[in-house]
Amino acid sequence: MKILFFQKFFLFFLFFCFFSGCATVNNNVNHDPRDPWEKTNRVIFNFNEKVDRNFLKPIAEGYEKVVPSFVRYGVSNFFMNLGDLLTAVQHFLQLDFKNSGESASRFVINSTIGVLGISDVASKFGFTKTIEDSGQTLGTFGINQGPYVVLPFFGPSSVRDGFGKAIDYMVDPFNSIVKDEEMRTAGNLLRVVDTRSQYLSAEQAFAALAFDKYVGIRNAYLA
């Protein structure tokens, strides 16, 4: 039930952001034509920064300090292995059958020999990891990226990639496999914290650069 509610909320927000952005675009000073909704995006960006600074970042720092590196490595590999399954499907939809087979092979090898993906054995066997999502697949169908948009909690995106994120969430292998709601919620929270911890060191270098952080993240995403 909570998963269904989240999906509806996420899609509702994308529509709201799109139409409210269209209504206010003429009132904003556009510094970048790719970001016509900059005023609204900056409000959401600042909200995300506060949530991260007050909640997510401290938890991620504690996670990195308390949990041994080999355990964190296994957690990251577990979720990335499930991502290989989704990537295989995306490659297939893009008619890229070679990479689809390679990603599927990675999933099978790591799920078995790598013990549920905890160890990335496939890379040692020469199977290259690639990452594809629904936003990229929509792009291969000729759908333009659209304006830049900052999503609450999810961060930088675009209109097309925002819908792609919603699709990815709905077909996420972990959410499909784990039926118990409490375990599913706990697993997703662990995934968020683990992912956030991987950016702690990079964030320090990023913060040391003397420029508008909003612009820096936007340009990096749209590059």
Regions found by a protein language model. Give the residues of each.
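Bacterial N-terminal signal peptides that target proteins for export
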Residues: 1-10
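Amphipathic, well-packed alpha-helical segments that form the structural scaffold of globular domains
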Residues: 56, 60, 64, 79, ...
